[in-house]
């Protein structure tokens, strides 16, 4: 028994040793397999397919930072700033970072932020809590640097600052309708800002960085330089713009008018030197301003041009040989198609100069009826009526121009004194710039151009010169535009008055007063159009309402630009032969 027990014990010990050895080997094998699997997995992830992990890691740590570039500056023709960008800050929050740090509390620092942003603390918390896992939300835009620095010093978790810019307009309401404005993202919304948005907007740069869990930059990965925006030099002369706006604004207030517009053009280049509207608005703070008040009426509003087209009627009649400059017309009122054609005052006879000076509807209508119906249509079209000026400003209208094959006599007659078509003040300014260049048509420009500017001759120079000379009589004693006269200077103008058209297409008891012309008449340098819409102070004729504004503006322009006076010397006789019939005085 003892021998058997002795042999059994070593056997068990041997079996136990074998078991331990096998188990150890199994364990080692498992470990080796695990290590092999892990090494294989690591090799797979690092060598064969690393993109996913790299992508996930980059999503957690890489950030793209925009390197902003300022919007281009807008200046007048002499470099005076009309729109500039000033540096400001945007305040933004990282909701996730903020919540991870404990969220918004009643701490004095959070109350200070609330006061700085003028936002109640509960509203601030509500905005941040709307998306607790979000990483970006604006709290305030275009914050001035001092306030932004104050907020930065609060050192609030999850609250960050970002560089941006805000547009500032030094001329304010003087150039508001022309320059327009941008939105909070520096995108052009109105005026030149919108029309030239691409030119004024640079290409932002980009910086890719790696951040740690606390948002600190630990590595610069790459960067792309920003491309600077272009500056824009306009044709506008800020001095003349201010002058035009001041006189126009005063006239609108004095005449209790609905609105007014004025456009000043350089005859030799087609450059728009001033374009103003009244009432205006402050582009630096237009909160509460009605959208309707922001439109540039000089390019968007259309009216029947009234008597301002009469010089073109006389030119057409002279060109076609219907009359000569010494012709005397019978201007007694007459009826046509059941309608009476008459003037404000009665004249039995008028020369062509008298027709313009007294603004005779009878005279120009007889000239129109003596010509083919297509004659005036062609002339008006040559001078640009019915065609957009292509100035480049968004919102410009091309007016309304008749497209008729057959015209009744009454339509032909009224067409000669500005009814049956509609134009913008800018289109009318282009007409008079062409008259001022003695029949050379040049495209208008809102940007500065270098002379000489070639043009297209659309009318014989001799005829246009003759009519310009006739137009001088309008501002002389006895003329309908005598209130536009400028001491020391000769001016060639035409006043006009037209009834307004209501929403239903019918004429209403409201009027538009015009005065358009060029100066100095001896060698025209500037063309000016003044439009006063719906004057309510008791007078509505162009000679009484818009003519004084024309004189004030053009006189200021001539003196500002140091144009030498060209008026006739005292005692020198004028060669005008105007009225050979009855009647005195004239209004238009």
Describe each region flagged by the PLM.
Residues 1-286, 374-386, 395, 503-507, ...:
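Periplasmic/cell-envelope proteins involved in peptidoglycan metabolism and beta-lactam response
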Residues 2-7, 11, 83, 211-223, ...:
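Beta-lactam-recognizing serine transpeptidase/beta-lactamase-like catalytic domain environment
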């Amino acid at each position: 028994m003892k021998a058997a027990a002795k042999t059994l014990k070593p056997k068990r010990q041997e079996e136990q040793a074998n078991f331990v050895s096998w188990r150890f080997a199994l364990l080692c094998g498992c470990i080796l397999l695990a290590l092999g699997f892990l090494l294989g997995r690591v090799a797979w992830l690092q060598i064969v397919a690393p993109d996913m992990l790299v992508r996930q890691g980059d999503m957690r740590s890489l950030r793209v930072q925009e390197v902003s570039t300022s919007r281009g500056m807008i200046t007048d023709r002499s470099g005076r700033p009309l729109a500039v960008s000033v540096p400001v800050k945007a305040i933004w929050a990282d909701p996730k970072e903020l919540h991870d740090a404990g969220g918004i509390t009643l701490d004095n620092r959070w109350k200070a932020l609330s006061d700085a942003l003028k936002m109640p603390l509960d509203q601030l918390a509500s905005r941040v809590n709307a998306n607790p896992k979000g990483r970006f939300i604006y709290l305030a835009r275009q914050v001035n640097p001092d306030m932004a620095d104050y907020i930065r010093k609060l050192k609030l978790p999850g609250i960050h600052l970002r560089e941006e810019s805000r547009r500032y307009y030094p001329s304010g309401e003087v150039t508001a309708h022309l320059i327009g404005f941008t939105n909070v993202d520096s995108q052009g919304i109105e005026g030149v800002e919108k029309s030239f948005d691409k030119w004024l907007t640079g290409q932002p740069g980009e910086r890719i960085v790696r951040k740690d869990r606390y948002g600190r930059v630990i590595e610069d990965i790459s960067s792309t330089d920003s491309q600077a925006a272009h500056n824009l030099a306009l044709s506008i002369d800020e001095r003349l713009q201010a002058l035009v706006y001041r006189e126009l604004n005063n006239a609108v207030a004095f005449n209790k008018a609905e609105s007014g517009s004025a456009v000043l053009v350089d005859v030799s280049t087609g450059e728009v030197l001033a374009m103003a509207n009244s009432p205006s608005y402050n582009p630096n703070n237009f909160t509460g301003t009605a959208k309707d008040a922001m439109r540039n009426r000089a390019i968007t509003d259309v009216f029947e041009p009234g008597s301002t087209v009469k010089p073109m009627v006389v030119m057409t009649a002279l060109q076609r040989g219907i009359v000569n400059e010494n012709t005397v017309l019978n201007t007694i009122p007459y009826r046509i198609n059941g309608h009476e054609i008459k003037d404000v005052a009665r004249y039995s006879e008028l020369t062509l100069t008298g027709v313009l000076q007294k603004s005779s509807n009878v005279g120009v209508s007889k000239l129109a009826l003596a010509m083919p119906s297509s004659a005036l249509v062609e002339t008006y079209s040559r001078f640009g009526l019915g065609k957009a000026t292509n100035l480049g400003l968004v919102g410009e209208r091309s007016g309304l121009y008749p497209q008729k094959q057959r015209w009744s006599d009454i339509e032909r007659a009224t067409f000669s004194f500005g009814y049956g078509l509609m134009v913008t003040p800018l289109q009318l300014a282009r007409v008079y710039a062409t008259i001022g260049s003695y029949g050379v048509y040049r495209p208008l420009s809102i940007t500065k151009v270098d002379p000489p500017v070639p043009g297209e001759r659309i009318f014989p120079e001799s005829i246009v010169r003759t009519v310009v000379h006739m137009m001088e009589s309008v501002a002389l004693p006895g003329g309908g535009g005598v209130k536009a006269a400028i001491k020391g200077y000769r001016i060639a103008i035409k006043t006009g008055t037209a009834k307004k058209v209501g929403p239903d297409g019918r004429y209403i008891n409201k009027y538009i007063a015009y005065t358009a012309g060029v100066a100095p008449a001896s060698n025209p340098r500037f063309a000016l159009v003044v439009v006063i819409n719906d004057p309510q102070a008791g007078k509505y004729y162009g000679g009484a309402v818009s003519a004084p504004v024309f004189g004030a503006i053009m006189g200021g322009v001539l003196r500002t630009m140091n144009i030498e006076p060209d008026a006739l010397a005292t005692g020198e006789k004028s060669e005008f032969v105007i009225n050979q019939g009855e009647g005195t005085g004239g209004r238009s």
